[in-house]
Amino acid sequence: MTPLSSELVGFTIPFYSKTQKPYSNSSHGLLLSHNRSSLLTFSNSNPNNDNGRSFSSSGARNLQTTTTTDATLPTERRQQHSQSLGFRDTQMLKIFHRSCRSGNYIESLHLLETMVRKGYNPDVILCTKLIKGFFTLRNIPKAVRVMEILEKFGQPDVFAYNALINGFCKMNRIDDATRVLDRMRSKDFSPDTVTYNIMIGSLCSRGKLDLALKVLNQLLSDNCQPTVITYTILIEATMLEGGVDEALKLMDEMLSRGLKPDMFTYNTIIRGMCKEGMVDRAFEMVRNLELKGCEPDVISYNILLRALLNQGKWEEGEKLMTKMFSEKCDPNVVTYSILITTLCRDGKIEEAMNLLKLMKEKGLTPDAYSYDPLIAAFCREGRLDVAIEFLETMISDGCLPDIVNYNTVLATLCKNGKADQALEIFGKLGEVGCSPNSSSYNTMFSALWSSGDKIRALHMILEMMSNGIDPDEITYNSMISCLCREGMVDEAFELLVDMRSCEFHPSVVTYNIVLLGFCKAHRIEDAINVLESMVGNGCRPNETTYTVLIEGIGFAGYRAEAMELANDLVRIDAISEYSFKRLHRTFPLLNVLQRSSQTFGY
C-alpha cells in the first residue's frame, strides 16, 4: 500500500464515523460495522446532552407518564415548610435566580430539584426561562424534566407550555409539540394565539402547509382568535408554493374577520407575485393600496425594483425610483445593493463603483451584500488584485467581509492556480472574525488535491469536521472522486452509502464516478450493483452511465455481454451516434455494427 493509500484508509474511517447519522439503518457494513462504537461515541459527544432518560419519539409521552421521585416529603409538610420559610426570601432562591441569569442551566436545575425536595414551590417564570435555556442547549430531557417538576410541585401556565412547544418545533419534533398541546387541553389550559402561531409557523417553515391549515381550523374551533401574524405566516407559506390566488383568498378571509393586513402582509404578497413573474399584477396591488390610503414602504419599492431589473427593464426601474423619491421614500442600503448587483451583472462595473460612492455620500454604510457583486465582477474579469484590495477597503470602512466575499476570492485564486495565495487568505479568516464554511473548505480541498498535495487536502477535510462543519454534497462528490482515482473504490462506495444516510441525494455524476471505479477494477458485478442501486434510488442513468458500463464489461473480457448490452441500448436510442462511434473505436463491436448500420448510416 502506498503512503497516500495508507493515509486515505486512515482518513475515511473517521470521516465516515463522523458523518454517519446515528439513526441510520444502513446494512453496508465495511466501515459502519467497524465503527459502530465510534458512531455511538460521536453521537454522545455533546457535553450538553443528557445521558439519562431517553426522549426519542416518546419524549412528550414521558411528560404524561413520569412520576417524579425527587420530592418525597408529604404534601402537608411541604406546604407548611414553604409557608414557614418564605420561598422567595431564601438564599437558595437568590442563587437560583443568579444561575438562571448567567445561563448556568445545569446548576439551576440542580438547585430547583434541591428546593422542591425541601418543600419549596417552583417559580413558573424561572422554570419557563430554564426550559428555554435547555432547548438552546438542545438538551431535551432536561427541558422536559423542568416541566415535570413544575407540573408536580408548581403551577405551570400557558407561557411555560408555549416555551416547551416552541422548543420542540424548533428542533423539528412536531409530534412531540402536538402531544404537549394535547396535554395542555387535558389539564384545562386553553392554548392561546401564540401557541397556535408557534405550531403554524413551524409547520409552514418545513413545507407542511396542509397541516398548518388544519391547525388554523383547530384554532378557530377552540374559539381562539387568529391575528394578522397568523394569516401572514400562512400567506407567506402559500406564496412559497406558488399559490398566489390561494394566498389572496387567505387575505380575503383575514379581512372578513376584521383583521387589517399590515405592510409586511402586503409585501409578502407583492414578493410572491414578483417571484412568479407577475410583476404587472404586483404593481396593480400597489396601486390599489394607494387608493386605500396605504402607502408602500421602501421594502415594497425594493421588491418591485428588483423584479423590474431582473427582467432588464431599466427604464421602468428608473421611473419607479423617480416615484419613490416623489413619495419621499428614501432609498436604503438594500435599494443601492439591488442597483449595484444589476449593474455588475450587466458588466457596468464603473457605474456600479460610482453608485457605491454615491451611497456613501448619502450617509449610508454599505454592507457585505453591497460589496459582493463588485468583488465577484472583478474576479470574473481576472482583476484579482483589485478584488483583494476591495476586501481591505471593506474592513477600513468598518464593514467586515462575510464568508461569501472571501469564498469568491478564494475560488478565483484556486481556479487561476494560485492555491498558495488562497491558503494564505484562508489561514487569516479566523483573525478577521470570519470563520470558513463548507464551501471554503471544499474550494481549498479541490485546489490542493488538483495541485498534487493530496495529504494536505485530506487534512483540510479533517479540520473542517473537527471545527463542527458538516460535509455537504460537494464534499462527498469531491471525496468520492478522489478515492476512485486512487483505486479505493470500496471506500468511495461506503461514502456513497453514507451520503444517502445523511439525506443527500447523489447525482448521476456521483454514481457514474463510482461505476467507473468498479469498471476500471474489472469488478463488473459490483458495477451492476451500483447501477441497480442508482435506479432503485430514483436516479436515472444517462448516456455516460451506459457507455462506462459497456466499456467496463468489454475490457473485463466479457465482449459478448458488452455487445449484447450495446445492441439493446442502440435499439432503444439510449446511446447517441457519437458515443457509439467512440465505443467502436475503443474495441470493435462487430455484431453491434452490423445491426446498427442502418441506424447510423454505415
Curated annotation (Swiss-Prot):
GTP-binding as UniProt keyword: no
Subcellular location: Plastid, Chloroplast
InterPro entries: Pentatricopeptide_rpt (IPR002885), TPR-like_helical_dom_sf (IPR011990)
Principal location listed in the UniProt entry: plastid
Pfam family, one: PPR_2
Biased composition (Low complexity): 65-74
GO cellular component: chloroplast
Region (Disordered): 42-85
GO molecular function, one term: mRNA binding
Disulfide bonds: none
Keywords in alphabetical order: Chloroplast, Plastid, Repeat, Transit peptide
SUPFAM superfamilies referenced in this protein's UniProt entry, alphabetically: TPR-like (SSF48452)
Residue intervals passing through the bilayer: none
Polar residues: bias regions: 42-64
Intervals holding PPR repeats: 88-122, 123-153, 157-191, 192-226, 227-261, 262-296, 297-331, 332-366, 367-401, 402-436, 437-471, 472-506, 507-541, 542-576
Transit peptide: 1-78
Family to which this protein belongs: Belongs to the PPR family. P subfamily.
Name of the protein: Pentatricopeptide repeat-containing protein At3g04760, chloroplastic
